[in-house]
């Protein structure tokens, strides 16, 4: 009944939602899209300007609806409230299973026309298509491929530690100990559940892509309750000892700033963090180092920002299709992702304009896609539905904060996931 109410609210909102959005041919009135997103940090906002300007050049005005919060949780809360109130946005930045949830309600538009014409099927990796399509139809336009198993290291601090990038767990711990001896915070981290889970993503992946897939994508109880999972929690406990006392509630971009300013040695974060370094005028290889979390080389846990369009009347569809087409154009994919810090959602975009970290990201995604190790990120909504993700978040955060032992965390993880399925 709740879903029906949502859809009814959307139906009544369709006309009012995009009022004033006339065809391009009507010079007196621009087409318009109202866009809900959570790209509010410096680097992210700069990237968003690329899309705004691209659409404006095509005669489509942009009404901005930003909601702060790096994981998108707050944005989805606002979206639910807007839809319930009968006032849904035109286009919404979404991740993974959130897209499927709205598609199952029949709330999203159909992008097949533009997708077929432009051959999206051939150039967008299959793991992304699992979320950009529903029941055989394109429902969302992937903007990028962010990978989450990155480390962002202050170059000066690394040089003081000998300059060697860690390739395994023991070398990572030795580096963190060195950072501590230098008098800086070893790990810049924000104590928010999605950030805790981002680290856990990488830690679990370091035990191998097969284990990660069994645990977080297949939700295999044996993997979730295994000794390997206990080892992963043990490593989280160890990493917790390298975080400063003021980490609770810190936004991710403020943690990035700690590394940028030399106050911390490393941040474990997706490649959206690179946008913060670039915004601060820092250069890869000179001021900071980007590398995969030790033990995850050759595999990529991804999330992909996508824009899903809500159903509107036929006269409003051209603007939505124009926006989708603009998002998937190779020129935009390059320009946007160079600024955003991510890899293009298309595999045919040249890496010419990208910096060293960007070139590595593109190469890593291609390698992982060909090897079957391009895996949806648990922490960012591409491994399992929101209920399961949130159940995992709860256990991971409590364990990271010392409220659960590793043994108890493993037991609770199995129970929590089973209950949330």
UniProtKB/Swiss-Prot annotation:
CC terms in the record's Gene Ontology section: periplasmic space
One Pfam family this sequence matches: SBP_bac_1
InterPro entries: Bact_solute-bd_prot1 (IPR050490), SBP (IPR006059)
Subcellular location: Periplasm
Highest taxon above the source species: Bacteria
Signal peptide, first to last residue: 1-27
Record keywords: Periplasm, Signal, Sugar transport, Transport
Family: Belongs to the bacterial solute-binding protein 1 family.
Described function: Part of a binding-protein-dependent transport system for a sugar.
This protein's name: Probable sugar-binding periplasmic protein
Organism: Brucella melitensis biotype 1 (strain ATCC 23456 / CCUG 17765 / NCTC 10094 / 16M)
């Amino acid at each position: 009944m709740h879903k029906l109410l949502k859809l009814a609210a959307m139906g009544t909102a369709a006309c009012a939602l995009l009022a004033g959005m006339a065809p391009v041919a009507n010079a007196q009135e621009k087409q318009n899209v109202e866009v809900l997103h959570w790209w509010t940090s410096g680097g992210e906002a700069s990237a968003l300007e690329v899309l705004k300007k691209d659409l404006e050049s095509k005669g489509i005005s942009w009404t901005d609806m930003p909601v702060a919060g790096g994981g998108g949780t707050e944005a989805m809360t606002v979206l639910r409230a807007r839809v319930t109130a009968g006032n849904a946005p035109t286009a919404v930045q979404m991740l993974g299973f959130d897209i499927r949830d709205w598609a199952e309600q029949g709330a999203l538009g159909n992008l097949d026309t533009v997708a077929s014409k432009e051959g999206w099927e051939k150039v967008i990796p299959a793991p992304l298509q699992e979320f950009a399509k529903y029941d055989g139809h394109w429902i969302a336009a992937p903007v990028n491929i962010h990978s989450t198993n990155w480390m962002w290291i202050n170059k000066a601090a690394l040089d003081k530690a000998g300059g060697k990038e860690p390739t395994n767990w023991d070398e990572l711990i030795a580096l963190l100990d060195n950072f501590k001896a230098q008098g800086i915070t070893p790990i810049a981290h924000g104590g928010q559940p999605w950030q805790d889970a981002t680290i856990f993503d990488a830690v679990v992946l370091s035990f191998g892509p097969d284990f990660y897939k069994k645990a977080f994508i297949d939700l295999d109880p044996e993997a979730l309750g295994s000794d390997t999972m206990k080892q992963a929690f043990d490593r989280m406990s160890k990493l917790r000892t390298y975080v400063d006392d003021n980490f609770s509630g810190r936004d991710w971009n403020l943690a990035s700033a700690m590394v940028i300013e030399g106050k911390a040695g490393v941040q474990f974060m997706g490649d959206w963090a690179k946008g913060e370094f670039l915004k601060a005028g820092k250069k890869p290889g000179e001021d900071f180092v980007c590398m995969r979390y030790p033990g995850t080389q050759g595999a990529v846990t991804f999330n992909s920002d996508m824009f899903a369009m809500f159903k509107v009347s036929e006269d409003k569809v051209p603007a939505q299709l124009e926006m989708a087409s603009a998002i998937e154009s190779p020129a935009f994919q390059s320009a946007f992702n160079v600024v955003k810090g991510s890899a293009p959602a298309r595999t045919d975009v040249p890496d010419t304009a990208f910096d060293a970290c960007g070139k590595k990201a593109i190469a890593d995604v291609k390698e992982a896609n060909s090897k079957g190790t391009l895996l949806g990120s648990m922490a960012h909504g591409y491994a399992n539905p929101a209920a399961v993700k949130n159940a995992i978040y709860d256990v991971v955060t409590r364990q990271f904060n010392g409220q659960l032992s590793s043994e108890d965390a493993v037991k609770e993880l199995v129970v929590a996931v089973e209950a949330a399925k």
